[in-house]
Structures are given as structure tokens and as C-alpha cells.
């Protein structure tokens, strides 16, 4: 089945229709119904709970959550994909139990009204708001961000109603199931990867500030400085060779005082990628890029040591939320530098919709592999 273009999805969102959006097969590998929150009707909620069967959620921007004084459900997010649930809500007026399709639609419309205020809603309730990351799918490639992006691109309030699609037997619907669902109900269907690609093509969210040659302990590198538009943090890229000419050795690195200054190993005894080790490894390659992601704050030393000393299963992403939230920035910088195929200095990780950035990981290289040589 041929997927629909992002332009087609945006047009349907603008017209008040639902669309299906799928994420990468190596992430949640699911599809959600998405529609503009400002257009939601009782029959739309009824369709979601009858045919999709997932949890009906309301995606909101950080600004809207602040406007409604909505706190996050938990301070420390341990969810696998770091979805930002706020406290559940109900409209303060015009409802009885709040669970009917009509009353859920009323709660949603109340929350996204232009002049909505905290007193218009109460907690808890039967609608589950999700706070999107600033920067949308270029920052975190989840359905939460995709819903806000699609509605914003449609010229509407950046808020959407989303619901996971579940098969008749209770299992999650995967792409073949979702294509059948879309055809059966006459819905447009697309991917978050395509939405990322659309935004990368039509928007500039990371700007290059400067370029200069610097000399390091490991030789000369080209130093590029970047900044996200609307964000004061500075990101750096150290480049060796010409990334456009072939497979490039890449490290996307966030500063950690324990790992980078004290050079402690992980709790399981394995070696962590320090800034020094990554730079040395890249210097030994024909082509390499080290992207240093700036942060608005540095975690305190005690917390950093505790975090590094906690055993974490390979495929658990709970401790990787910071990496999931910043990989989009690193990916944009890599694309600006011409990187396409890369050897990634990292343990195997599932990055959100990486294909949307036209990036391909051909090999993962762990720090232990390098130090064992």
C-alpha cells in the first residue's frame, strides 16, 4: 500500500479528519489515530474507543500545559520511551461522570480553547494529556510530538487527540494491520520518519554559527558551532576529513562529569565512552565527527556517579530519555555536515525515526571494542 504524503496528512488534519501515523519499526512499532483536538466531536471519540481501542490521549505543547497549570504525572520518568504524561483531567463544568464520548470530547475542547484557564479543568479525570517536547519530532520522534507538529502545520492550535490502534485479538497493530485498517475506514496513513523529513526540508531549526580550525592532542579538526533556534545552548561538532565522501565514524556526546573527567567505568565493568576516548578514536579514522550536545545544566557529581553505577539492561531505554530527547539535534547537525552512513560509537541503541534524517547506522562500536585493541 502506498503511503500518503505529509501534505495530504496535513490537509486532512486541517479538515478535521483523522489520520494514521506510524513510527519506526525499531521503536514502538505502532500506529496511532491522530486528529486535531480543536475539531474533536463525540463521534470521533466513539470511533477511537470502538475501533482503535487504545488509550485516548491529548497532546499539548509545553506552553499550553503551563497555561492550564498542568504538572507532570511523575517527576522522574521511568517509562520506556519517556512519554510525558501530565495529571489526567476533566472539564470543570458541563459533565456528569466524564467517561462518555460526548463528555470526553467536551473536556478536550475545553482544555484547548484559546482562553482556557486552570479553573476550567479539574484533576483527575478521563482524559490523559501528554506534554510534547519543544522542537517536536526533530527533538523526540514520538506520536505526542507528531500530533502537535501536524496540527501546528495545519494552522491550528498545536494539540491533538491520539489513540493507539489495537487488533481484534488485543495485540498491537503493526504496519500490515494498519494498512488494512486505513483502507477499511478510508483514512490517510503516513510515518513519523516522513514528517521529520518534511520538517527538515521545509524548516530550519538548527543554525550554524561559525567554523574554524583547531589543534588538539589528537591533531587538527574543523570546529563548527551550532545553536537551536530559540534555544541559547551551544552545540559543537569536531570534524576530521570530509563526511560526504563515505562512511563516517560518529559520536554524539552529552557531557557527563564522571565519564569525561574521572573516567569511571560502568557498573557492569564495561568501558564508557568518554570525550577523550571518542576523540582519539575519531582521530584514527579517515572521516569522523564528534557532536557535543550542549546542556542548560549539568547534573551534580553525586547524581552522576549514582547514575553511572546503576546496572541497566541493554534494551531498556528508561535511562536513555536524555539521549532520546537530544538525538534529533545531533541528527540535524550530522545532516548539515553531510553525514549519511556512519559507524556509531555507542552500544546498540534504538534511535527515533533515524531514517527521517537520511542517516543510516552501518555499525555500532562499543568503547570496550576500542580499548581491547
Question: Where do the language-model regions lie?
Answer:
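Catalytic domains of riboflavin
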Residues: 1-373
Amino acid at each position: 500500500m502506498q503511503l500518503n504524503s505529509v501534505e495530504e496528512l496535513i490537509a486532512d488534519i486541517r479538515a478535521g479528519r483523522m489520520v494514521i501515523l506510524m513510527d519506526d519499526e525499531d521503536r514502538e512499532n505502532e500506529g496511532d489515530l491522530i486528529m486535531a483536538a480543536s475539531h474533536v466531536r463525540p463521534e470521533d471519540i466513539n470511533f477511537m474507543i470502538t475501533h482503535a481501542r487504545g488509550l485516548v490521549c491529548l497532546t499539548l505543547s509545553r506552553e499550553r500545559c503551563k497555561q492550564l497549570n498542568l504538572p507532570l504525572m511523575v517527576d522522574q520518568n521511568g517509562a520506556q520511551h519517556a512519554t510525558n504524561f501530565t495529571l489526567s483531567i476533566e472539564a470543570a463544568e458541563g459533565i456528569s461522570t466524564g467517561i462518555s464520548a460526548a463528555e470526553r470530547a467536551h473536556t478536550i475542547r475545553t482544555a484547548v480553547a484559546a482562553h482556557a484557564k486552570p479553573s476550567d479543568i479539574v484533576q483527575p479525570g478521563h482524559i490523559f494529556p501528554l506534554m510534547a517536547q519543544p522542537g517536536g519530532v526533530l527533538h523526540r520522534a514520538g506520536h505526542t510530538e507528531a500530533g502537535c507538529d501536524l496540527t501546528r502545520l495545519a494552522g491550528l492550535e498545536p494539540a491533538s487527540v491520539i489513540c493507539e490502534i489495537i487488533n481484534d485479538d488485543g495485540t498491537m497493530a503493526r504496519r500490515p494491520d494498519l494498512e488494512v485498517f486505513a483502507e477499511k475506514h478510508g483514512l490517510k496513513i503516513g510515518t513519523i520518519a516522513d514528517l521529520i523529513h518534511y520538517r527538515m526540508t521545509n524548516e530550519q531549526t538548527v543554525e550554524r554559527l561559525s567554523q574554524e580550525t583547531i589543534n588538539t592532542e589528537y591533531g587538527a579538526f574543523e570546529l563548527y558551532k551550532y545553536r537551536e533556534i530559540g534555544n541559547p545552548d551551544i552545540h559543537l561538532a569536531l570534524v576530521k576529513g570530509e563526511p560526504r565522501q563515505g562512511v563516517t565514524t560518529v559520536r554524539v556526546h552529552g557531557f557527563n562529569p564522571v565519564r569525561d573527567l574521572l573516567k569511571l567505568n560502568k557498573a557492569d565493568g564495561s568501558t564508557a565512552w568518554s570525550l577523550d576516548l571518542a576523540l582519539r578514536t575519531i582521530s584514527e579514522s579517515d572521516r569522523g565527527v564528534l557532536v557535543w550536545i550542549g546542556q542548560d545544566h549539568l547534573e551534580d557529581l553525586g547524581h552522576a556517579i549514582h547514575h553511572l553505577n546503576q546496572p541497566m539492561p541493554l534494551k531498556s531505554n528508561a535511562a536513555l530519555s536524555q539521549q532520546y530527547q537530544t538525538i534529533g539535534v545531533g541528527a540535524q547537525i550530522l545532516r548539515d555536515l553531510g553525514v549519511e552512513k556512519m559507524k556509531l560509537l555507542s552500544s546498540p541503541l534504538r534511535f527515533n525515526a533515524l531514517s527521517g534524517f537520511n542517516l543510516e547506522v552501518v555499525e555500532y562500536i562499543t568503547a570496550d571494542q576500542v580499548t581491547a585493541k
